[in-house]
């Protein structure tokens, strides 16, 4: 058997084996969950500064009274921000100038986005329904800053806004 006569068949078999190897490899990683995570790319708890993590732990273990969505813990404002159908709760956050802010962002219904332009830059993150996301920032200039839902999820999503009011 001359290899030149059967080069096309050999090439086909080699490529078929490679395709089967890569296909099997991907099936294995997808079926075991090793290649996909809903946390990938999302702002998670571990990405917060250590003091912010401690404040979130305290906030979670000592939740504020009903109707209260924020609490100052060790000089840091911790806000539980929830996105529901076409609104944010709360939709107004009042913070002192240069006061660190930690947002605990929840969305029980749909994927949402959070977009806030501050003098120091943009905070833009996504939130997957049912998975908590976190944001940490400090605004050093008084004023009103509007955040928006950056993920279009349906009718009136573009009107989902809120305001960070920086005083002092």
UniProtKB/Swiss-Prot annotation:
Question: What GO MF terms are annotated?
Answer: copper ion binding; cytochrome-c oxidase activity; oxidoreductase activity, acting on diphenols and related substances as donors, oxygen as acceptor
Task: Name the InterPro entries for this protein.
Answer: CcO_II-like_C (IPR002429), Cupredoxin (IPR008972), Cytochrome_c_oxidase_su2-like (IPR053624)
Instruction: Kindly state which keywords UniProt assigns to this record, in alphabetical order.
Output: Cell membrane, Electron transport, Membrane, Oxidoreductase, Respiratory chain, Transmembrane, Transmembrane helix, Transport
Protein family according to the UniProt entry:
Belongs to the cytochrome c oxidase subunit 2 family.
Which residue windows are transmembrane per the record?
9-31
- How is this protein named in the record? Quinol oxidase subunit 2
What subcellular compartments does it reside in?
Answer: Cell membrane
Q: Which gene encodes it?
A: soxA
Function text: The terminal oxidase is the component of the respiratory chain that catalyzes the reduction of oxygen to water. Subunits 1-3 form the functional core of the enzyme complex. Subunit 2 transfers the electrons from caldariella quinol to the bimetallic center of the catalytic subunit 1 that is formed by heme A3 and Cu(B).
Instruction: List its EC numbers.
Output: 1.10.3.-
Q: Which residues form a coiled coil?
A: none
Q: What is the lineage of its organism?
A: Archaea, Thermoproteota, Thermoprotei, Sulfolobales, Sulfolobaceae
Q: Where is it chiefly localized?
A: membrane
Topology class, membrane: Single-pass membrane protein
Q: Name one GO biological process term.
A: ATP synthesis coupled electron transport
Q: Gene3D superfamilies per the record?
A: Cupredoxins - blue copper proteins
Which Gene Ontology CC terms are recorded?
plasma membrane
What is this enzyme's catalytic activity, as reactions?
A: 2 a quinol + O2 = 2 a quinone + 2 H2O
**Superkingdom classification of source:** Archaea
């Amino acid at each position: 058997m001359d290899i030149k006569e059967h080069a096309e068949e050999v090439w086909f078999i080699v490529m078929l084996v490679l395709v089967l190897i890569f296909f099997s490899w991907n099936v294995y990683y997808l079926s075991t969950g090793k290649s996909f995570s809903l946390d990938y790319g999302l702002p998670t708890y571990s990405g917060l500064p250590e003091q912010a993590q401690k404040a979130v732990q305290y906030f979670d273990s000592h939740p504020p009274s009903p109707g209260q969505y924020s609490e100052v813990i060790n000089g840091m404002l911790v806000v539980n921000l929830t996105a529901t159908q076409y609104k944010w709760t709360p939709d107004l956050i009042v913070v002192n100038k240069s006061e660190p802010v930690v947002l605990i962002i929840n969305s029980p219904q749909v994927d949402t986005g959070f977009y806030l332009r501050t003098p120091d830059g943009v905070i833009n993150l996504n939130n997957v329904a049912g998975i908590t996301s976190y944001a940490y920032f400090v605004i050093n200039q008084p004023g009103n800053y509007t955040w928006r839902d950056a993920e279009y999820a349906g009718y009136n999503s573009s009107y989902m806004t809120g305001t960070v009011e920086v005083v002092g």
